[in-house]
Each structure stands twice: as C-alpha cells, then as structure tokens.
Swiss-Prot record:
SUPFAM superfamilies: Class I glutamine amidotransferase-like (SSF52317). InterPro entries: Class_I_gatase-like, HST_MetA, MetA_family. It is found in: Cytoplasm. This is Probable acyltransferase. Keywords: Acyltransferase, Amino-acid biosynthesis, Cytoplasm, Transferase. The record marks 192 as: Important for substrate specificity. One of its GO terms (cellular component) is cytoplasm. The keyword Magnesium does not apply. The gene is metA. PANTHER family: HOMOSERINE O-SUCCINYLTRANSFERASE.
Length: 309
C-alpha cells in the first residue's frame, strides 16, 4: 500500500533509498480512488526516526494510505527540529472533528513514570476516547498498550523487575485469526520495555482475544473481537540497529543495561546486529490495514459513528 505523505517529508527519500514505494501528495492527487486516512500519534522523542519506521511498515500494500502525523505534547522538543514539527504535524484541535480509517499510537519511553505524572496524560486520554467515535481501528504499540489498557479497561500499570530487551520467540495462539493470517507458527519480534503484560492479566480483566504470546515476554498480540482495537506489546517497527542504539545509550548514561537477548551476533555488542523480525512486522501491519481497517471502514467517513459496544 503506497503511503501518501507530504512531498517534503524527510521520510520520502529515506524510504525510497530502501526500495520502499512512497507516493507524494502531488502524484496521489492524480489517482481517482479513495485513500485510507491513517493518523499516527507519535509519542517518541526522536520523531523522524519513528516516522521512518512506521511509514516503512504502512507502505507495502496495493492501496493508498493518506498519512496524518499528530502530536499532543506542546513542549519544545530536544530531539526533533521545531520546523519539522510545524511543517508536518497537526495538533488535536486541528483534527478533532475529522474521522479516520486507522490510528497508530506509538510507544514512548515512559514505562517507569506513573500515568498521572505523564505531562500529556490528559491529552492521550482525550484522544483515546475521541477515537471511539472517529476511528475505525486503532493499533497500540508498546507503552501505548499500557496506557490504553489503563484508560479503556482500568488496568493499573504493571512493571517488570528487570527491563525486557532483546529479540524473543513468540508462538501463535489463534493461527486462523485475521490479524495473524500468514504468520509462521513461531516468529521473532523485538521488545524494549519495563512494562509487564502477563497473559493471565489480559484474560482476567478484559474481553480481548490473545493471538500470540511469548514464554519470556508474555502477551504479545491481542485484539478486540470487533477489530476496533489491536495491541502489540513489542516493537515490530524497530530498525536493525535500534536496540543497539538504546543499549549503548543506557551504558553511556551509567544504567548498566543487560545485553539484549538473542540480538548481537555472538552476544558481542561491537558486532553489527541483523534484523530477524522484518517480514513479521510487515505482515502484521499489512493484516491490520487490510482486515481491521480496509475491510470494515465505510467508504464515506462522514457516515462513520462506531462504538465499542
């Protein structure tokens, strides 16, 4: 699915260099089809890097996806130029009366921060409740999963004794589910989190269907029966070097991090790691776009008023 973005967005050249099909707005305007409108709530500090990662996964399918980037933290960014934010991001007030086919809520480095100490907690609460009536399907990733479980299901924050970092093996629980269609029976996916998602907790406190899990990482992929909500506790969008960057950053900050599991060649952080989860990440997002968004969203978004009931 070619993604449709601003002509000047830095991700255009970055992704084209990776042989990823990107369609600029000027070219897309010549095609007489309705593109899917997908809103990305980017909560990560390095916004350009995160844009590249998610746009890569959203790009590999036959229909147009019209991307809108959203920010809810008005503080000055230390990691992203103000010009970039002003040019390519909207505020919630700009889109609060619009409808979208899909919403992606990214992770955030906030797993050790109490929810009500998160500066933009009221804003994310507002966005998630707004999405009930304005978005066909929402995909939550890592910290966003923890936030959504608290806001939508009242589940308190659960924290691991030791940070989970590395590439872990997962196995399917529902191989015939639409979201896992085409998945291998076992597959690899990266994690980088302090949040804990025990399978028993999800089953006990929600009606969500757990689709895949890991012996080490717990529940990995789960979703609502109506396809309105999908949750991924890992980071299938990560680049090959993202975990390495986080590991070296934490070492430089004196945090004494553990070596990411099943990641560095020969467990040597001086060797360049390879991505072993890329095909899984592409298939997961393609399935979400197809079965959770495209197949159930109305052609005329003005007629959409979905509920979670």
């Amino acid at each position: 699915m070619p993604i449709r973005v601003f002509d000047e967005l830095p991700a255009v050249n970055f992704l084209r260099n990776e042989n990823v099909f990107v369609m600029t707005s000027s070219r897309a305007s010549t095609q007489e089809i309705r593109s899917l409108k997908v809103l990305i709530l980017n909560l990560m500090p390095k916004k350009i890097e995160t844009e590249n990662q998610f746009l890569r996964l959203l790009s590999n399918s036959p229909l147009q996806v019209d991307i809108q980037l959203l920010r809810i933290d008005s503080r000055e960014s230390k990691n992203t130029p103000a010009e970039h934010l002003n040019n390519f991001y909207c505020n919630f007030e700009d889109i609060q009366h619009d409808n979208f086919d899909g919403l992606v809520v990214t992770g955030a480095p906030l797993s050790l921060v109490d929810f009500h100490d998160v500066v933009f907690w009221p804003q994310i609460d507002r966005v998630l409740h707004w999405a009930r009536d304005h978005v066909t399907s929402t995909l939550f990733v890592c910290w966003a999963v923890q936030a959504a479980l608290n806001i939508l299901y009242g589940i308190p924050k659960m924290t691991r004794q030791q940070k989970l970092a590395g590439v872990y093996q997962h196995h399917l629980l529902k191989p015939h589910a639409l979201l896992t269609r085409g998945f291998d029976e076992t597959f690899l996916a990266p994690h980088s989190r302090n949040a804990d998602f025990p399978t028993a907790m999800i089953r006990q406190h929600t009606d969500l269907e757990i689709l895949a899990e890991s012996d080490e990482a717990g529940a990995y992929l789960f979703a609502s029966h109506d396809k309105r909500l999908a949750f991924v506790t890992g980071h299938p969008e990560y680049d090959a070097l993202t975990l390495a960057s986080e590991y070296h950053r934490d070492r430089e900050n004196g945090l004494n991090p553990s070596l990411p599991v099943n990641y560095f060649l020969q467990d040597n952080p001086d060797l360049t790691p390879k991505a072993s989860w890329r095909s899984h990440g592409h298939l997961l997002v393609a399935n979400w776009l197809n079965y959770y968004v495209y197949q159930i969203t109305p052609y005329d978004l003005r007629r959409m008023n979905p509920t979670l009931e």
